[in-house]
């Protein structure tokens, strides 16, 4: 492991659905370390990493009774990243977890597995160069941002589709930048609608995150 390693924490609860976490590691430039967090929620030594990415999950952040054994350590990790100013990227469930850990609200919504249109609403280097069409796989949405978080993008159905921390190097996206044609057949309910993968360049998010991490080295 080098001082520039980005840790990818996979928070998927279903082993046979852990196809997206490895894709995050694959699309993130530079050295990465992948770890399935749910089976072993031992807090990582954050000082050993240059940044952290929190993956999506079929779990819900508000289901603490079922998932508290690993959700509580994840929330602690999020708050530690903010306190220590360790670059953090939350993807889908990770977006929800960051906001929930900081006192925001996440609620159940319509299941979506398709491309959606995103509109930028605030400054966010993590979204630089990312087009408006992005893939989503989610059934929960953030309805109230966590303390210190500000909105950076919205959709027709959700005002807080992406966010960032006002002071710490923390960014979150509700969409799945790592979801590409390579894994399009994994979720059984995927329906691209009127768009195709040629219409999106959402993996750019990981290049932008690496750039932000490197700037802080």
PLM features: residue spans?
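N-terminal beta1-alpha1 cap of cysteine-dependent amidohydrolase-like domains
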Residues: 1-73, 79-86, 191-217
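Hydrophobic/aromatic beta-strand patches that form the interior of the parallel beta-sheet core
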Residues: 7-9, 35, 53, 89, ...
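Short amphipathic alpha-helical segments
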Residues: 20-22, 64-67, 102-103, 147-148, ...
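Catalytic metal-binding/acid-base residues of hydrolase active sites
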Residues: 36-38, 59, 94, 140, ...
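Pocket-forming structural segment of enzyme catalytic cores
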Residues: 99-171, 175-180
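C-terminal and late-domain segments of enzyme folds
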Residues: 159-217
């Amino acid at each position: 492991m080098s001082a520039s390693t980005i840790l990818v924490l996979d928070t998927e609860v279903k082993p046979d659905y852990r196809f997206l976490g490895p894709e995050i590691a694959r699309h993130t430039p530079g050295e990465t370390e992948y770890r399935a967090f749910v089976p072993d929620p031992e807090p990582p030594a954050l000082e050993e990493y240059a940044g952290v990415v929190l993956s999506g999950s079929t779990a819900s952040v508000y289901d603490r009774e079922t998932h508290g054994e690993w959700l509580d350590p994840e929330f602690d990790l999020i708050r530690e990243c903010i306190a220590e100013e360790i670059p953090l990227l939350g993807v889908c469930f990770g977006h929800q977890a960051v906001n929930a850990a900081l006192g925001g609200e996440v609620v159940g919504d319509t299941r979506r597995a398709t491309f959606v249109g995103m509109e930028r609403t605030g400054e966010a280097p993590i979204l630089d160069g990312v087009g408006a069409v992005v893939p989503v796989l989610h059934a929960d949405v953030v309805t109230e941002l966590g303390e210190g978080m500000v909105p950076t993008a919205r959709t027709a159905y959700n005002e807080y589709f992406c966010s960032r921390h006002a002071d710490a190097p923390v960014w979150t996206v509700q969409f799945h930048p790592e979801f590409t044609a390579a894994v399009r057949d994994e979720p059984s309910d995927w329906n691209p609608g009127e768009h195709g993968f040629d219409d999106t360049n959402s993996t750019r998010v990981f290049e932008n995150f690496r750039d932000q991490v490197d700037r802080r080295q």
